C-alpha cells in the first residue's frame, strides 16, 4: 500500500515553490514601475539638509574685512582640540588672527565652533566632497579657510538666514 503522504509531498512542494516564485515576481514587478530611489552619485546629488555640517570656512564682511576677532572661543570649545589660533593686536586696539589652523583629521564636525563664534566667522559649509591624497592636505590654514568662505559665501549666507532660529 502506498502512503498518501509520500505521494502528495512532491505535489505540495511543487505548488508551494510555484506560490513563492509568484510572490517574488509580484514584488519585483511592483517595484519596476515605482520611481527609482537610488541616485547615480557623481552625476546626480541628493538634497542636503540646511543644517548639514560640511567643510569649514572663514567668512569676511562685505567690505572685505575678516570677521574673526580672535576671541578664541572656537579653540576653547573644540572637544577634539583641532583648532589652533594665534592673535595679534592692531594699532586701533582690536585683535585679528595671524594664524588660524584646523586639523581636519581631528575634527569631529560637531559644530560647536560655529555655535560659539559671536560674529559667525567660522562656519561649516555645504561642501562634502573634499577627499585628498595626503594627510597634509587636511591641515587647513587661514588662507584655505578664507578661500572656502569666498567660494561658498552665498550658500552659507542662505543657510544662516534660513536657520537663524537655530543659531
From Swiss-Prot:
UniProt superkingdom: Bacteria
Signal peptide: none
EC number(s) on file: 7.1.1.-
Compartment(s): Cell inner membrane
Enzyme class label: translocase
Gene Ontology terms for molecular function: 4 iron, 4 sulfur cluster binding; iron ion binding; NADH:ubiquinone reductase (non-electrogenic) activity; quinone binding
Binding site for [4Fe-4S] cluster 2: 78, 107, 110, 113
Details of cofactor binding: Binds 2 [4Fe-4S] clusters per subunit.
Catalytic activity reported: a quinone + NADH + 5 H(+)(in) = a quinol + NAD(+) + 4 H(+)(out)
Pfam family, one: Fer4_7
Domain (4Fe-4S ferredoxin-type): residue spans on this chain: 59-88, 98-127
Binding positions for [4Fe-4S] cluster 1 per the UniProt entry: 68, 71, 74, 117
Membrane topology: Peripheral membrane protein
GO CC terms of this entry: plasma membrane
Stored HAMAP family: NDH1_NuoI
Oligomer status and interactors: NDH-1 is composed of 14 different subunits. Subunits NuoA, H, J, K, L, M, N constitute the membrane sector of the complex.
Similarity comment: Belongs to the complex I 23 kDa subunit family.
Role played: NDH-1 shuttles electrons from NADH, via FMN and iron-sulfur (Fe-S) centers, to quinones in the respiratory chain. The immediate electron acceptor for the enzyme in this species is believed to be ubiquinone. Couples the redox reaction to proton translocation (for every two electrons transferred, four hydrogen ions are translocated across the cytoplasmic membrane), and thus conserves the redox energy in a proton gradient.
Protein name: NADH-quinone oxidoreductase subunit I
Source species of the chain: Ehrlichia canis (strain Jake)
Gene, per the UniProt record: nuoI
